[in-house]
Curated annotation (Swiss-Prot):
This is Outer membrane protein assembly factor BamC. Part of the Bam complex. It comes from the Bacteria. GO terms for cellular component: cell outer membrane. The lineage of its organism: Bacteria, Pseudomonadati, Pseudomonadota, Gammaproteobacteria, Alteromonadales. It is found in: Cell outer membrane. Part of the outer membrane protein assembly complex, which is involved in assembly and insertion of beta-barrel proteins into the outer membrane. It comes from Shewanella oneidensis (strain ATCC 700550 / JCM 31522 / CIP 106686 / LMG 19005 / NCIMB 14063 / MR-1).
Length: 365
């Protein structure tokens, strides 16, 4: 079948095209492969051996070096570098593989689920088929990923095409504490074809590493975008005001009910408490405790609250946070240094200052 082509294409068609196999090979001859090492000079007895310059001596092969990687078998391309661009990630290089260590950036999100969701979205966006997926084992194996490139175009017949087919496996290992996980990628299968004929390619460890790094960088780059979106959303959420209600039960001490998740309330209190005149001397987020100290500062309160000072004695106090009855509620108790509840009247008066600052919207920093 005769193809319609433009004159520009005719000019391009006669230009030599290098195949992916040739791109990894050095240009020029390979006579050096057959080169023989010249013997050392034989010095007659009685004469001194002249000094030799060892600057250009070729070092001996190491125990892990492959002696077959010479000539056309030697890949001259520079190595690829792993780019841990996503927030909370870094690289750990082992003897057999390269892994990305991913740290949690949001305690309210399951890290393993976040990684799997990002990988699923990445595969869908890149139209990469999946052969198997096992969340419990932390493994995703792709089906064949094909890349085609036309190397020779014919006017009267079919084009000669180069085809690269690969399959990868992503392993996700989460630490028992759930705050750190590892992502390791393996090249499971690799095939190369030219004009329908399979090419015999000897992949070295560096070749496999090159392909896996390229795929790993693409996946991490996608995760970087998603994590940045999450960080921006969380920062915006932190700027929003939090409504706080005063709860005075018939029995028991009065407390405050903040209409937000525990982490959001905890972070907001770190800003609000100093503005109320409290000094944070210590804190324990796992136990939900703020150890605070109050010092009466009339000048501060006069300017901020129109001479309406907190009805608190100077001294040390504790602020206790607990999860509420719903995920969007956090309960807050104000207690003295001996962990005893304060009177409902004091809690009620402090509430006026606390609620006003908590519901105030902040500028995004």
């Amino acid at each position: 079948m005769l193809k319609k082509v433009t004159p520009l294409f005719l000019v391009a068609a006669v230009a030599a095209c290098s195949s992916p196999l040739e791109r990894r090979q050095a240009n020029g001859g390979e006579d050096y492969v057959q080169a023989e090492q010249a013997p050392m000079l034989k010095i007659p007895e009685g004469l001194k051996t002249p000094p030799y310059n060892k600057e250009y001596d070729v070092p001996a092969l190491g125990p892990k070096a492959n002696p077959a990687l010479v000539g056309k078998n030697l890949d001259i391309r520079p190595p690829l570098q792993v780019l841990p661009m996503a927030e909370g990630t870094h690289v750990e290089e082992g003897s057999d593989n390269i892994k990305i260590v991913v740290e949690s950036i949001d305690n309210n999100v399951d890290l393993k689920q976040e990684i799997f969701t990002n990988l699923d979205d990445f595969f869908a966006k890149q139209a990469i088929p999946i052969r198997s997926r096992d969340f419990d084992k932390g493994s995703i194996e792709t089906d064949w990923i094909e890349s085609r490139e036309v190397l020779e175009s014919s006017l009267w017949g079919s084009d000669k095409e180069y085809l690269l087919r690969q399959r990868y496996r992503f392993d996700v290992e989460t630490r028992p504490h759930g705050r750190t996980a590892n992502i390791v990628i393996h090249l499971v299968e690799h095939e190369e074809f030219y004009d329908g004929k399979e090419q015999k390619v000897m992949l070295s460890g560096e070749d496999k590493q090159r392909y896996t790094i390229d795929m790993l960088n693409s996946a991490i780059a996608y995760m970087s975008v998603k994590r940045e979106q999450t960080i921006q959303a969380n920062r915006l959420k932190q700027t929003l005001g939090i409504n706080v209600d005063l709860i005075t039960p018939e029995e028991g001490a009065a407390y405050w009910s903040a209409k937000a998740a525990y982490k959001q309330v905890w972070d907001r209190l770190r800003i609000v408490l100093p503005e109320m005149g409290f000094e944070i001397s210590d804190m324990d987020s796992a136990k939900g405790l703020y150890f605070i100290k109050f010092t009466d500062n009339s000048g501060f309160w006069s300017s901020l609250w129109n001479n309406n000072q907190l009805s608190l004695k100077e001294g040390s106090y504790r602020l206790l946070l607990e999860d509420g009855d719903t995920p969007d509620e956090t309960k807050i108790w104000l207690r003295d240094a001996e962990d005893q509840p304060l009177s409902n009247d004091v809690v009620s008066k402090v509430y006026e200052s606390l609620s006003s600052l908590m519901k105030e919207e902040r500028k995004l920093r």
